[in-house]
Amino acid sequence: MSLIGFLNVAELGVGVAVGYSLYEPLSKNKYEKINDIMILFKYYYRNIAKIILILGAFLSLFLPFLIKGQVNINLAYIYYFLYLINCSISYLFTYKQTLIIADQKQYKIAYFLNTTKIIKMIAQCIVLYITRSFFVWILFEIIFNCLGMILANKKINFEYKNNITYKSSKTIKIIKEENAHISKNIGNIFFHKLAGFIVGQTDAILISIFSNLKETGI
């Protein structure tokens, strides 16, 4: 859904900026620095999840104006909020994956993510064939996405259990000041992300406003 894609702009490029900032301390085994960056990253992503939920709830007020044609508006709201929940939840789990990706050890979690993805797709196909229920399809999307991220995070926690605690005696304010370059990079990346969304994702929203969902899908 392009409307959910719009909400993802709230990510601001935090993941890219943090991932870039991890390369140098990882290469020099500066685990205290890495731990501080990950605490900051967790703080940012939790706030982004909250912002997406709030903005998503607000934008839902405009769904009747964005959807044309004969559509069950109640079902549209249910599907929309399920997608919104799926989007928000991902920010509570995926920040740890940035660490292992920056450390070039993504292969250690690929098994969990790929296996749950394959099982999810098979289960969704079976459900669609038997029930023709899009609601259950989205529900499976959320459940298996969460399962994959939880398993991946357990592996990441085990991988860095002796070095990364995600805890510090420092306050978030101090950690921000010590890593001011991350905020600067986030600002630079945000405008590129916004431009990319405007160019590639607004078409479907505009088509749905002036046409209907069937033509939007085509």
Question: Locations of the language-model features?
Answer:
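Helix-terminus/linker motif at the lipid-water interface of multi-pass membrane proteins
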Residues: M1, F65-K68, L128-T131, F190-K193, ...
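Alpha-helical transmembrane segments of multi-pass membrane transport and lipid-handling proteins
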Residues: K42-Q70, I122-Y129, I150
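Interhelical loop/hinge segments that connect adjacent transmembrane helices in multipass membrane
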Residues: A152-Q201, I205, E215
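Hydrophobic alpha-helical transmembrane segments
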Residues: Y77, F81, Y111-N162, H181, ...
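Interfacial/gating helices of multi-pass transporter permease domains
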Residues: M1-V9, I37, F134-L139, E177-N185, ...
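Alpha-helical transmembrane segments of multi-pass membrane proteins
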Residues: I54-F65, Q70-F93, A110, N114, ...
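Membrane-interface junctions at transmembrane-helix termini in multi-pass inner-membrane proteins
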Residues: C87-F112, I130, F135
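Small-residue-rich midsections of specific transmembrane alpha-helices
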Residues: M1-L26, F41, Y45-I52, C87-F93, ...
